[in-house]
Curated annotation (Swiss-Prot):
GO MF terms held by the record: structural constituent of cytoskeleton
Family according to the record: Belongs to the avian keratin family.
Record organism: Coturnix japonica (Japanese quail)
Record-linked InterPro entries: Keratin (IPR003461)
Modification type N-acetylserine: residues: 2
Keyword ATP-binding part of the UniProt annotation: no
Gene Ontology CC annotation, any one: intermediate filament
Entry coiled-coil feature ranges: none
Protein name: Beta-keratin-related protein
Protein encoded by which gene: BKJ
């Protein structure tokens, strides 16, 4: 930083007894430059909201396909257990072995 004095050293007016002048003397300095950096700012952005909607659906029936009458397939009566699977003809578990009902709750496979 450089400074200079604009004060005049030439006598002003009649020669005084003291070495002084009636004009003000100001010390002037060059302008300064300051770089002010703002402090860091933390911004929190919300993350995605992950939702899961598990859907498990069971389709089937535990009731007989024939309501109010007796149903038979090949002279074999079909009960409640046999109504699931192969179109309600007393066969269940297609691909896992065929099972049906004989008479009153007797199951054959």
């Amino acid at each position: 930083m450089s400074c200079y004095s604009p004060c005049q050293t030439v006598a002003c007016g009649p020669a005084p007894l003291a070495n002084s002048c009636n004009e003000p003397c100001v010390l002037r300095c060059a302008d300064s430059s300051v770089a002010i950096q703002p402090p860091p700012v933390v911004v929190t952005l919300p993350g995605p909201i992950l939702s899961s909607f598990p859907q498990s659906t069971a389709v089937g029936s535990t009731a007989s396909a024939a309501v109010g009458s007796s149903l038979s397939a090949g002279s074999v009566p079909v009960g409640a257990r046999g109504s699931l699977g192969l179109g309600g003809f007393g066969w269940s578990g297609l691909g896992r072995g065929l099972c049906g009902t004989l008479g009153r709750g007797n199951v054959f496979c």
